[in-house]
């Protein structure tokens, strides 16, 4: 049952205060939001009704709201981390509710829903969404997710593919392997753990873990001596003690989850929107999703950070309505990448900095260079030696070795490499995300010990066939 938002006593019967229409935007966005949108107007939307229900999966209460014509196609909005909850979508809600039946909610642990120390994991949130939406709109709907909500939307579309007609994702958090994600998410998400470690001491933490799980592990190389993160997350006592807010629990669960298998199962056409200045969720994630999701389109919002709905509500509303209203056979829904085209042009960088490569090449050699970027390249072979290189959205199809990396540090995103050997690494550090490696002899050959991080990567060779999402050190002579 969804209660009409109105007299406070109707909700006090359930033991909680009546939710307010007025939300609280992040402080950096308040001026923009106040200038363009009155949150109190949400209550006056046609078909608006809201209230609290018994929260499936988690227990307690969950705030759920609907707006717009009930006989119109449904749009479900899934918010990200932060206690604003569904209020983050308020600036775009009037535009959506004019044409669509909109369902939004505060996920358990956030906003006006019950806060606790439950396991706020992606899988449990997906079950919650399935139950809540199923009670209100059985059948296919359009699914929109922001930040953590974007990751939940992906997992939902993979888990219940018949439910989702289209996806729209904004600044998706998570997805990358936790080591690749560490610089901008891991430490922020575990701020409380570090504080507790400094207060109670590592011995006390180890004692609690030993009692709960009979084992201890370091937090990989990030925080030597810290508790194992999965034990911390899944043990009720440790979770309540050290992860003392739903945001921290949900953030840690998000970082530790592996969304690669889900991404491979998503079939819904997808638009991806990203704020140019997002310091929380890397654009690299958007490139991975664009490359690995079928019929996906990627758009940058130049004036936005992590919350485009707040900083550019008019632009986001326009893009949302454009996407939702497109015919199923529109080229923006069915577009496929162009085929690899041969070229006789060769590219070379030697002892230089800041060089950029784009377009078609027979081969590219990078020797002793720093700050080199390859973007939208199609080539027959690439050699990187003693260099610092970023490679994005690149295809290499070789007769011998597609990509050879020697004594270098390379970040590779949304690329395809194929050849007798797809990747040959010697004494290098390579961070791969959304990369497919296809080798007739080997997908990966290690000529010298190398460190590699794999996020949502594919490997196809006579030696191995499958999915890579791990951080490993590979010894000389390894073939995969």
Over which residues does each language-model region extend?
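Glycine-rich beta-solenoid repeat tracts in large extracellular/virion proteins
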Residues: 355, 362-367, 380-385, 401-406, ...
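Short beta-strand/loop motif that positions the catalytic acidic residue
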Residues: 266, 272-274, 278
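Flexible "cap/lid" loop of the alpha/beta hydrolase fold
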Residues: 158, 167-200
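Acidic catalytic loop of the alpha/beta-hydrolase fold
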Residues: 254, 277-281
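Active-site loop/oxyanion-hole signature of alpha/beta-hydrolase fold enzymes
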Residues: 104-144
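Hydrophobic, aromatic-rich cap/lid helix
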Residues: 231-259
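Alpha/beta-hydrolase fold catalytic core
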Residues: 2-3, 12, 21-76, 99-100, ...
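Conserved HGGG/HGGXW glycine-rich cap/lid loop of the alpha/beta-hydrolase fold
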Residues: 67-112
